[in-house]
Design a protein with these regions (language model features):
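Bacterial N-terminal signal peptides that target proteins for export
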Residues: 1-8
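C-terminal motif of bacterial Sec signal peptides marking the signal peptidase cleavage site
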Residues: 17-20
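Interaction-mediating elements
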Residues: 22-320
Length: 320
């Protein structure tokens, strides 16, 4: 068996040498082999933490790995692209051996049509806008190689001015909700002067949702408030308001307290429950004559008590 493998590799070496180890001989007409990126150029980019974070995201968005990529890099390639050589040497063949070689050892070439720089620049521009660079732009250039069947890419990123938060307001909430927001203002995920950032604003909306649900607003959900932004009044800044929707029903706007707590104890998902043990506010449902857990143990584990404001965090902690 070892001799067979040695023979195959020796034969493969002869074939590759005879074809000049070409990486483009079987590339279709009208196509070019993508051979990686030159380092992206950044114009007028500052060294702030926010700008650095955006650059790191852009590197991921713009990257396309070529054949023989080293460590997943779009700019570094191994000089030995054996899989690509095999594909070029055998992919045009019609014999069973040709097909087996391509399937077993070949690597399909990464073509320029797959690299699709137009798509990457569009996604990159959208990212810049979401991170506060409203006037940012991305372009690319094709970098010809000695072999006309090969092509590199280079992107250029003009980040432009970073737009910041002018004011952050909360509109349409009840007096009780306004009081909660004010009491926890120091926990806000963004504030005046901070970069305009869609992901940070979404985190702030989630924080407000969690704040309400931990303070009795059982029916409140994140989608019940949305952002309105004004980027016209003061160029370079955005006035942002998180506004409660108009069509919210009354039960969402009031707080709810804990009355009775019901606990179902099952040894398996489909076990029938036929017994209920009643307490002042705790009802334990189980199968059989005795509860699998003592009431005191259950009471110590349950973080919500009768008369308390409902808290989603305490409910989750109880259920863990």
């Amino acid at each position: 068996m070892k001799q067979i493998y040695l023979f195959l590799w020796a034969a493969l070496g002869v074939v590759l040498l005879s074809t000049g180890c070409s990486s483009t001989s079987a590339i279709p007409d009208g196509e070019q082999l993508y051979t990686g990126m030159k380092p992206t150029e950044y114009v007028d980019a500052d060294k702030s933490e926010h700008a650095t974070s955006v650059r790191e995201e852009l590197e991921v968005v713009l990257a396309t790995k070529p054949n023989g990529s080293l460590f997943g890099s779009p700019t570094l390639q191994s000089p030995l692209k054996i899989g690509l050589w095999i594909w070029n040497a055998f992919s045009q063949g019609t014999t069973s051996f040709d097909k087996w070689m391509v399937k077993a050892f070949g690597t399909q070439p990464v073509l320029m049509s797959y690299a699709n720089p137009d798509l990457h620049t569009t996604v990159g521009r959208n990212l810049l806008k979401k991170r506060g660079y409203f006037n940012g732009d991305i372009s690319y250039s094709l970098v010809p190689q000695k072999n006309p069947k090969k092509m590199k890419l280079q992107y250029a990123v003009k980040m432009g001015q970073l737009w910041t938060i002018d004011t952050l307001g909360y509109v349409g909430f009840t007096p009780g909700q306004d009081s909660l927001i004010s009491a926890h203002a120091d926990e806000a995920m963004t504030r005046s002067g901070a970069p305009f950032d869609i992901s940070t604003l979404e985190s702030e909306r989630q924080r407000i949702t969690q704040l309400f649900r931990d303070n009795g607003y059982f029916y409140y959900e994140k989608g019940m408030a949305s952002y309105l932004a004004d980027s016209v009044s003061r160029p370079g800044t955005v006035a942002v308001n998180l506004q409660l929707l108009d069509s919210i029903d009354g039960r969402t706007l009031r707080t709810w307290t804990i009355r009775n707590i019901n606990v179902n104890l099952r040894r398996s998902l489909f076990e029938n429950i036929d017994t209920t043990s009643h307490g002042r506010s705790l009802r334990v449902h189980y199968n059989g004559t005795h509860s699998p857990l003592r009431r005191r143990v259950l009471s110590n584990q349950i973080k919500l008590k009768r008369g308390d404001l409902y808290s989603a965090s305490l409910q989750e902690e109880t259920q863990q």
